Amino acid sequence: MFITFEGMDGSGKTTALLKVKEELERLNYKVLITREPGGEVIAEQIRQIILDNKNKDMDAWTEALLFIASRNQHLQKVIKPALEKNIIVISDRFIDSTSAYQGSARNIGVDVVSEVQQIVLKNCLPDLTLFFDVSFSEAEKRMQIRGESSKNRLDKEENNFKQKVYQGYLELVKNNPKRIKVIDANKDIDQVYNQAIKIILEKLKENEKRTSN
């Protein structure tokens, strides 16, 4: 099964991901956690270009295509091989990030970005996506705890950009209700984790029941 975690920076999705992995392994599932942009040697090199604070003048389409190129490398060399071995893959970000950040916030258009991704990635969709929905104030507070030094080029965007990203995510949730489930990420990490693992275990049980029939 292929699961993706999505949300604004500071939503707590990465912390929850690690706790989910630990619990699934305790239940004897084989799990691979990975991230985007990156997750593979060449994809990580592309990540450095995308997030480098020096690259402030990057064109919106250049940015989008770099994300998609990194994603395809990650998909072909890491995600697909793991799925073929019946390993549960959980990725910190995937296609919906590019739709929200570049399609919505960079004003390229969600539909256009989705079309390009479908062509390049051959319609590869996650089985389940969790959107970690957090308020701007809570996300900012968590980002401050992480420290300014941890901020990359996209973290440093203005609030107007982040608002567009958020609206992009809400639109994706609205248009993909079967795949994308919402997590209330304003709660403490244990409550956030409990929401996430409940949905994931239900999906796993559903898949296992379908396979056995």
UniProtKB/Swiss-Prot annotation:
GO terms for molecular function: ATP binding; dTMP kinase activity. NCBIfam families: DTMP_kinase. PANTHER family: THYMIDYLATE KINASE, UMP-CMP KINASE 2, MITOCHONDRIAL. One of its GO terms (cellular component) is cytosol. ATP binds at residues 7-14. The gene is tmk. GO terms for biological process: dTDP biosynthetic process; dTTP biosynthetic process; dUDP biosynthetic process. This is Thymidylate kinase. It is an enzyme of class 2 (transferase). Keywords: ATP-binding, Kinase, Nucleotide biosynthesis, Nucleotide-binding, Transferase. Pfam families: Thymidylate_kin. Its EC number is 2.7.4.9. Belongs to the thymidylate kinase family. It catalyses: dTMP + ATP = dTDP + ADP. It comes from the Bacteria. Phosphorylation of dTMP to form dTDP in both de novo and salvage pathways of dTTP synthesis. InterPro entries: P-loop_NTPase, Thymidylate_kin-like_dom, Thymidylate_kin_CS, Thymidylate_kinase.
